[in-house]
A protein has these predicted regions:
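Hydrophobic alpha-helical transmembrane bundles of multi-pass membrane proteins
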Residues: 2-313
Length: 313
């Protein structure tokens, strides 16, 4: 600290801030990076390369969705809260990925602790690549981790939109940490790691692209948060509902289009392979989004006598 304080322009508070950031910077440089265990691996097949490359591209699209979420939320809120929402979306995704790397992935895909209910494989994500993975044209653990971590971040971002303009930055960060490190991974293990949802009598539970694991978990968490926090300030005056228009619908519209693009990573990428079903899923995603936009336009025109951009988004 004495060295930092000796530098011109550094106050005591700034010196403490830089010292606090040092461990995180070291982690980013690779001090805590877990390297794969070396073993003799077979030759990489075309299918193996295609599957992993496709999932990596899909992961980038899913991560890019966070820009869409941030723009939709910021554009639909009041101007005074826009900076808080943007900061929240950016930081929470970084926090979610770190929490999922530290313990979340292990809780979701680890070994059974309580059969069907709880799994754990130790702290920190293990990136070990095996010969079997390559021979079966499977996914490299690091690629699979990145895709799943992007899903975890999405679950937290869903909640962010539902409690927008209702919660302070610090409190939401704590909640997002608990959600992405424990709640989401445990719920995900119930289906994607052979948990109890796979053995409910004769009924087969199928979750494609996180319909329940990501979106339902995020939605339920957001609903509880909205109920506990109550309505936004100014939403009700003398018991009457007041419209709170967004301050920048251009940004919100652009965010919606970015989300549309991101869905081509979220849904087709959930095939976890480059196969014949990927284009089919992409077409279904396109028609679903188009149908939703058309339906919202028609309904808002009937109820409000004119199209409502907020409803279309």
């Amino acid at each position: 600290m004495l060295l930092l304080k000796g530098i011109r322009g550094f106050s005591s508070n700034r010196a403490m801030t830089w010292l606090a950031c040092a461990p995180l910077a070291l982690m980013g440089l690779g001090i805590f990076t877990l390297s794969a265990k070396a073993e003799e691996l077979p030759e990489l097949s075309a299918a193996f390369l295609a599957n992993n490359l496709w999932l990596l591209v899909a992961t980038i699209l899913v991560i890019f969705m966070n820009a869409g979420f941030a723009m939709v939320e910021a554009g639909m809120c009041r101007q005074k809260n826009a900076v808080n929402i943007l900061a929240k979306n950016l930081f929470v995704f970084a926090l979610a990925v770190t929490a999922y790397w530290f313990v979340g992935y292990s809780l979701m895909y680890g070994d059974s602790v309580i059969d069907g209910w709880l799994y754990f494989g130790g702290l920190f994500f293990d990136p070990t690549v095996t010969a079997e993975t390559i021979s079966d044209a499977g996914l490299v653990p690091t690629v699979d981790f990145l895709f799943q971590a992007a899903f975890a971040g999405t679950a937290a971002t869903i909640v962010s939109g539902l409690v927008a303009e209702r919660i302070k930055f610090g409190e939401f960060v704590i909640f997002a940490l608990v959600l992405t490190a424990f709640i989401y991974p445990v719920a995900g293990s119930w289906e994607w790691n052979g948990g109890w949802l796979n053995s409910v009598g004769s009924v087969e539970f199928i979750d494609f692209a996180g319909s329940s694991i990501v979106h339902s978990v995020g939605a339920w968490a957001g609903l509880v948060g909205a109920m506990l926090l109550g309505p936004r300030i100014g939403k009700y005056v003398d018991g009457k509902v007041q419209a709170i228009p967004g301050h920048n619908m251009s940004i919100a519209t652009l965010g919606a289009l970015i989300l549309w693009i991101g869905w081509y990573g979220f849904n087709p990428g959930s095939q976890l392979a480059m196969d014949q079903w990927v284009p089919y899923v992409a077409v279904t995603t396109t028609l679903g989004a188009a149908g939703g936009a058309i339906g919202a336009t028609v309904i808002s025109t009937i109820t409000s006598k004119k199209p409502d951009l907020t409803m279309i988004i």
